[in-house]
């Protein structure tokens, strides 16, 4: 079970985008995350009339390593860590500071 999953609200704790918040769009296999509106890079694309792509300079999100982000706890309005707890025979994710379920 992963500590950070798709659609989690996160905050960047290190790097050029430190302090920015966003939602996880994609979780990649090598402990990297694509976060909406964070770590934007410019990519030069060729026009492709067959696919309807105009071409030019496009801004898109680049992956960040999971060690540079922390899950955002809406209750405390701070970055938090994730722990695990077994309730009713199921393993759930909980915030370390409040011990409340992340997915609640």
Swiss-Prot record:
Functional summary from the UniProt entry: One of two assembly initiator proteins, it binds directly to the 5'-end of the 23S rRNA, where it nucleates assembly of the 50S subunit.
Keywords carried by this UniProt record: Ribonucleoprotein, Ribosomal protein, RNA-binding, rRNA-binding
Subunit structure: Part of the 50S ribosomal subunit.
Domain of life: Bacteria
UniProt-recorded name of the protein: Large ribosomal subunit protein uL24
Listed SMART domains: KOW
Record bears the keyword Protease: no
Family according to the record: Belongs to the universal ribosomal protein uL24 family.
GO molecular function: rRNA binding; structural constituent of ribosome
Any one biological process term the GO annotation gives: translation
Keyword presence, Ribonucleoprotein: yes
CDD domains: KOW_RPL26
Xref: PROSITE patterns: RIBOSOMAL_L24
GO cellular component: ribonucleoprotein complex; ribosome
